[in-house]
Amino acid sequence: ADTGVITGNGFIIDVQDVQQPVKGLSVHRAVVREGEVHAGADVVAQVDVQRRRDGEKAHSGTHIIHAALHQVLGNEATQRGSFNKEGYLRFDFAWNEGLSESAKREVEEVANLAIRDNHEVITREMPLAEAKALGAMSLFGEKYGDVVRVVEIGGEFSRELCGGTHVGSSAEIGSLTLLTESSVGSGNRRVEALVGLDSFNHLAAERTLVNQLTGLMKVQSSADLPEKINQTLAKLKAAEKELAQLRREKLQAEAGKLLENAQTIGSVRVLAHDAGELDANGVRELALDLRSRFGSEAAVV
């Protein structure tokens, strides 16, 4: 919903939200910044235009994501819910399994091609029956009146029942970047995305990170990073394994000295040693080695 400022003679109100609990009644949630508000006072309402524009990009981006999911996955990927604000959107849809990396890339590509193609965004009011005949998508479980508002992006590419504000053409969105895809309950998935300048800033930050990794790993191209990282991880794992083996051998070599430090309590010999540098397998091997040195005596670890 819109935010903004309402000013009157001697007072300023910051509007934080606008809702319509019943048709024809708009309710403003606001905070009085200064002065005292009087009923019947003349006021001037000023909408935060930039915030509205950024919100429109996210809202239209939500419609485009919905259409892209339908194109890639099929009409079974129906909307289960959504949320959008300046620069950000999330979209819940019916689907029984996580999306593959190739499917996510395809959804993102379809969405950005629709943005690039600069589709005109058209809003029309029409009878509900006519909207359904045109194939306009509606929110599952939502109740609609006899006359509805239909938002079209690129004609048949996206046609939905919607009462919100939108961009004039899809290119105004700029770009769309998928962030995550996750489960939100049995049979439902969620995608999150950034649009506009937030999308650009995210991609710029990732590019900076990749450039830093390319320099740290001393490779010529970012395309070489996966192989180089896998090689480095394999070397690290081998080095850790070798180090653990050396520690075990060192302690085993000192096992005799450890036994010399055993104390006799009553008729029982007790040996206490901090083997914190060993992993579970190392502790077990050391214990078995020490037990074998006890001879015929019973040993409890």
State where each predicted segment sits.
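A glycine- and charged-residue-rich anion-binding loop/surface
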Residues: 1-301
